[in-house]
Amino acid sequence: MGHSVAGVCLEEPAVLTAFPSLLHPQDPPQQRDRILFVTAELSDFVKVGGLGDFSAALPRVLRRQHAVRVLLPGYRQVLERCSDLRILGSLPGRAAIPPCEIGLVTLDDGLEVMLVLCPLLYEREGTPYMDDQGNDWADNHLRFARLCLAAAEIAGGHGAQGWQPGLVHANDWPSALTPAYMAWNGVRTPSLFTIHNLAYQGLCDLQCSAELGLPDEALSPESMEFHGRLSFLKAGIAHAHHITTVSETYAQEITTPEYGCGLHGILKCKVEKRQLSGIVNGIDDSWQPHCDPHLVAGFSARQWAGKRANTRYVEERFGLEPGKGPLFAVVSRLVQQKGIDLTLEISDALLQAGGRLVSIGRGEPSLEKAMLDLSRRHPGQVGVHIGFDETDARRIYAGSDFLLMPSRYEPCGLSQLYAQCFGSLPIARCTGGLADTIVDGVTGFLFREETAQSYLDAVLRAINVYHCPALLNAMRCKAMAAPMFWRDSVEPYNRLYRRLLRNTAPAWRGVRP
């Protein structure tokens, strides 16, 4: 049953994540609706953040009840790993958007992935969004408009040898123009748009409208005009039949000026129309501490010896003095949003209280330098690696006592769920998905104020618990039992899909915030 919090219509909570290890028996094909899942990332091939994980996991669990195809740009690194690509058809260009072909590849577990093949736009060195120097591609508006236009045309029955979806699910700004192009093309297929991070809006100049082949109505505040620019994200919000976010609390937060990034007005209108809901992300089946092959040794809530073995690995790997107080971990991008500056601000007090700190991740150069400087000032107490390694990250979750997540905002967050699964108690700011997935004093520690003092108070509470082994183990056991898995929690999406498939009314349009 859905429920309402602070005026936001929310679906029943689900804990959802992202990884490709989920296979289910499927219903007979004739009973399954066709779903087109549009994304800029798929962790099987290319991943920048949580979107890649989400896009790999949700379509897989949805396949039990639906015939799902993922639509992804044909990046160079994707094509290099596709040996059995089959061309389905071609689509024309529009304005400055070049034509493309649509290819199909079937992954080992049966997931079907359609690729937008456009060498001019996608076959480059770098990430999906940036060149190898870390600069945004200057033609990103064209690159992702091509993805969105292809999705809209496939929804209209073109380019995929007759395969036509009954519902289109777009994700974040790179695919946000999909519901808009569908509306402008006269395609009445229902559309769902998931916001993973409202702060990334896909902005470009108004003059780009001609290159994108936009109708005049697109330039209005009721569509994608945003303070004198064009916003891909706003287009998705304005034209999709329903909007979801990746946690219930984040769905509430983005309707406020503090978190709404200038879009709180249109999002409030979505609430009034019951077209905004939150479904919490969660974790994949691979996060099982008793059998994870990445770990030095497995462990469980009944047998902790393996956790201690992972702690010893982390101590040796990061040059920490063994067995000297609680081990705090940072597994994160080193950016302001994640509150890394707050961790640096309290680090001396944390260390003076007997704590140790290990950090893995990369991000803003100034924060990378500050973390390295901290480790140099405190050899044996602080270990830092700039970069990311999946095996080391998992061993840090397993070997640490506490995970630090003082995020300024956090649409969902996955690290706190991974940590809980591995018996590391998260210390986090009470925002977004962190508020939805951590029970203060039970499965972790929460603080509300965005201040170093509030954060430090939570850290000191955690240190007090560390020195009470019975309480520490009780909290660890509860934390390890807390996270849910995709296989258990896909039903809110299934219910939402069924509702949208029953109602194909034209998308409601928002108002200027």
Swiss-Prot record:
Pfam families found in the cross-reference section: Glyco_transf_5 (PF08323), Glycos_transf_1 (PF00534)
This protein's record includes keyword Transferase: yes
Residues involved in ADP-alpha-D-glucose binding: K47
E.C. code: 2.4.1.21
GO molecular-function terms, A-Z: alpha-1,4-glucan glucosyltransferase (ADP-glucose donor) activity; alpha-1,4-glucan glucosyltransferase (UDP-glucose donor) activity
The keyword S-adenosyl-L-methionine appears for this protein: no
PANTHER family xref list: GLYCOGEN SYNTHASE, GRANULE-BOUND STARCH SYNTHASE 1, CHLOROPLASTIC/AMYLOPLASTIC
HAMAP family assigned to the protein according to its UniProt record, in alphabetical order: Glycogen_synth (MF_00484)
Family statement: Belongs to the glycosyltransferase 1 family. Bacterial/plant glycogen synthase subfamily.
Protein name: Glycogen synthase
Name of the gene: glgA
